Amino acid sequence: MKLVTTTNDFAAYTSNSIEAIEYVKNAGFKYIDYSFCIDYKNKTGIYSADEDYIEKVIDKVRELDVCLVQAHAPFYSFIFDGDISGLIEDTIKCVRACAKWGIPSVVVHAGYQRNISKEENFRKNKEFLLPILEAGVQYGVKILTENFNKMEFDDIYWIDNATDLMEFIEFVNHPNLYVLWDAGHANLQEMSQEEELTKLGDLVLGLHIHDNYGDFDNHMPPFWGTMSMDSLMQGLFAIGYKGYFTFESENIFLSQEHRRINANDSRLLKAPLELRIKAESLLYEIGKTILKTYDCFEE
C-alpha cells in the first residue's frame, strides 16, 4: 500500500496548490491527494482566470517526480435549500481537471438540509450527484462519496455509517459511484472499523486516515487519539483493499482558528512553515510504520 497525504495539509500556509504540492514533496511524500478546497476557497487554481494552470500542475508534478493519485472536491456549505447548479458545475470542473492530471477518482461529499427526512435527503443528493457521475463516466474519473462525521443536530440527517452508505449507493444506482471510507469520522461513532468496512467490501476505493478522541472531528494523525489502527487494518485486509493509504490528518498542530489570539503579537499564531514540513515528515514515518507492521508498505 502506498502512502498519500493531501495538499490541504498546507492550506494555512499558501493559497497556491502548486506550492502545497512542493511542501508535501519536501516532507517525503511521493503520492499526493489534490485538494480543490484550496482552489475554491481562494479562487485560485482551477477556479482562477489562469488558462495555463492545468499545464502548470502537470509540469510541476513532472519536475518533482510525484504522482497525483486522488482528489477532493470543494467542501461547500452543501445546504440544499436553493439552486445547486453552481455547485454541480464547480464539481464537474474538478472532474475535468482530474482527467487531465490522470487522477482516477475524486471525493464528493453528500449534502444535507434541515428538517427533511432521510428519504428526501437521498433524493436531493441523487439529483446533485447524477450529472457529476455522468461527467465522471465521460472523463474516466470515478466518483467517491464518504461517511461523514457524527451529526450533532437532531433536525439534520446525513450519511455517517456503512449501512446508510450502502443504502444510498443502491438508491442512486449508478455504476460510477463508489465509497471512500473516512476512518476518523467512523471513530466518532464508536463503531468497529473492521465490521463497517466488511459491509462495504469492494465498493471501498479510497481512504481518509485521521484520528480524534471520539468527541470532535479533530483530523489528527494516528496515535494522537482513540482510533484502533488494528481494527482499520484488519478491515482493509478483510475486503482485499487495493487502494492508497491516504492521510487527512492536517491538524498535526491545532489549526490557528482554535488558538487564543494575542492582540499585540501573532508571530507564533501558527507554527513556522519549516517546522510544519518537519511535522509532515513525521506523519510519513507514522504511516510507514503502520504499513510496515502489517507487511504492506510500498515505496
What are these regions, as identified by a protein language model?
Residues 33, 70, 107, 144, ...:
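Conserved beta-strand positions in the central sheet of alpha/beta enzyme cores
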Residues 80-82, 111-122, 149-157, 217-220:
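Surface-exposed cleft-lining segments at the edges of enzyme active sites
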Residues 1-104, 137, 174, 178, ...:
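N-terminal pre-domain/capping segments
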Residues 139-172:
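Basic- and aromatic-lined ligand-binding clefts that recognize polyanionic substrates
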Residues 1-4, 14-28, 159-181, 185-299:
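Histidine-acidic metal/acid-base catalytic patches
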Residues 9-11, 36-38, 74-77, 110-114, ...:
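Active-site-proximal loop/turn and secondary-structure-junction residues that shape catalytic pockets
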Residues 48-54, 84-92, 121-129, 158-163, ...:
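Charged helix-capping and loop-helix junction motifs
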Residues 101-118, 139, 144-151:
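Active-site groove signature of glycoside hydrolases
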